[in-house]
Amino acid sequence: AGMAGVSVATVSHVLNHRDNKVSPEVAARIRSIIKEVNYQPNTVAKALRSSKSSIIGVMTEDLSVWQTGSIVQGVTHYAQQNGYSVILSDLGLKDKIKTDYDSIYKYRGVISKELQRLQAVRVDGVIFIGMHDRDVKGLIETDIPLVYAYCTTENADDVQVGYDNREISKKITQMLLTCYGEEIAIIGGPIQSAPAGQRMAGVEEAYADAGISMNLKLRQNGNWEFESGQQACRDILK
């Protein structure tokens, strides 16, 4: 304000895009000085005044899991396009949980601590990205607006973003049957896994619609790990 020879209120009008309250010449001078000194607004202070921070918290079960990085990238790009910043909190649970995905509930304390950290910077909302597509009902309790991605919850009030395992699997199988015939090898996840069951149901529905019987010798189940998939391929190719 001092460098521009104007009041703090006038600078605030320009920073908050209320240019109709400032003459074009003054607004241009203020913007030039802002660029010259590389001024960065204090988002926390702004949040304290307005109760809105324009910051989204993204919490990942584990950033190293193959699909998570792409989801975070998509969230970040969309947030930036809409004037939001993103704070990432990676729980790093892959090596602790391994394939015992339901053991995530053992780490509710860790999740709660990270939520408190995000609350401290007054995020407007949190996106929780799972590392496995399964039900996490009751995992997180918070008053912050929360969206689940790549995991589900049976709570009717929870907001979640995902996809239809059964329908996608059905369409993929229909395409393969049309292009390559009926001898298709199927490698699925654990039999007790809900998403694996949904995907297999889609495969079976596609076969039924085509009036073709599945060759059960070409059907194997694994545990989501690369080594398991390799072994399933070997068993099918014997």
Residue ranges, per PLM feature:
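Periplasmic-binding protein-like
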Residues: 118-130, 185-188, 219, 236-238
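Glycine- and acidic-residue-enriched helix-capping/strand-helix junction motifs
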Residues: 66-67, 191-199
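Alpha-helical recognition/docking segments in bacterial nutrient-uptake
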Residues: 51-174, 178
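Aromatic/hydrophobic pocket-lining residues that form π-stacking "cages" and hydrophobic walls in ligand
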Residues: 30, 75, 203
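N-terminal helix-turn-helix DNA-binding module of bacterial transcription factors
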Residues: 1-53
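Hydrophobic alpha-helical segments within soluble ligand-binding/sensing domains
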Residues: 159-186, 201-208, 226-235
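Short beta-strand elements in bilobed, periplasmic/extracellular small-molecule ligand-binding domains
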Residues: 79-106, 186, 204-230
